[in-house]
């Protein structure tokens, strides 16, 4: 029986737009953005930011050097937020439903301070939550959040999954991991967690409920 659900952020809760992010960084002057940016796991200074090895200020300085001009904090944030196509209202509704039904909800994400400055603000769900007309940050919808830059490890490193399972003191066999990255799903499954692989931008809410109902039925077999 599933008691806890661990969600990825980008590609699950938030619809990712990798192409738009590339376009924005190219506009900032990063001509090779298409070869530098990755949909799942960043490398170079982008990866250093997401694993907590570089601060936002260090990232800004490095990006300025790569672009050949001074890049501001707001421009860095604008570039990163190119990834955030939208947050479907149905996803917010589903998170609230799952918590009402007693599931412990956890977010585990390869992300960075620029993205989380938006995600943790009321802009995250403004206009999407009828109970929060002014909007609420992502932490309002989860019991715990683990950004890669705070944990200092990125998926698909198994240590990320092990850290969350240990910190939350949850049984992997009673935990469902939801992620749009096949490699992340593959590694997470080795911990004993159940897994669900939705497709970025496709409605996963009803398939998830179907999966959870099947898990409940297994208990009674």
State where each predicted segment sits.
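N-terminal helical cap/lid subdomain that shapes the substrate entry/recognition surface
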Residues: 2-93, 100-101, 112-116
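Conserved phosphate-coupling serine/threonine residues in phosphotransfer and NTP-handling enzymes
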Residues: 109
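Structured helix-beta-strand junction loops
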Residues: 101-102, 141
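Asp-based, Mg2+/Mn2+-dependent phosphohydrolase catalytic module
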Residues: 1-3, 7, 112-113, 117-221
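Surface-exposed charge patches
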Residues: 23, 93-96, 163, 186
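Anion (oxyanion) recognition and catalysis
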Residues: 99-100, 189
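Proline-centered loop/turn at the N-terminus of a beta-strand
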Residues: 104-106, 194
């Amino acid at each position: 029986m599933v008691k806890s659900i661990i969600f990825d952020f980008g590609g699950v809760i938030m619809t990712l737009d990798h192409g738009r992010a590339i376009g924005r960084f190219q506009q900032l002057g990063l001509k090779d953005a298409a070869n530098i940016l990755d949909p799942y796991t960043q490398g170079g200074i982008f990866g250093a930011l997401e694993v907590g090895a570089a601060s936002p200020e260090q990232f800004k300085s490095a990006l300025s050097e790569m672009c050949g001009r001074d890049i501001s904090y707001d421009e860095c944030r604008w570039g990163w937020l190119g990834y955030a196509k939208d947050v479907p209202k149905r996803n917010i509704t589903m998170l609230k439903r799952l918590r009402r039904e007693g599931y412990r909800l956890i977010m585990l994400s390869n992300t960075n301070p620029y993205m989380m400055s938006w995600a943790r603000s009321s802009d995250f769900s403004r206009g999407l939550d009828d109970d929060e007309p002014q909007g609420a940050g992502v932490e309002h919808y989860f019991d715990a959040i683990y950004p890669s830059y705070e944990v200092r490890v990125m998926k698909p490193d198994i240590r990320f999954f092990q850290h969350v399972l240990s910190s939350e003191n949850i049984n992997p066999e009673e935990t469902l991991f939801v992620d749009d990255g096949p490699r992340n799903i593959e590694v997470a499954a080795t911990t004993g967690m159940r897994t669900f692989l939705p497709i970025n931008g496709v409605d996963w809410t009803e398939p998830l409920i179907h999966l959870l109902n099947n898990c409940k039925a297994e208990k009674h077999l």
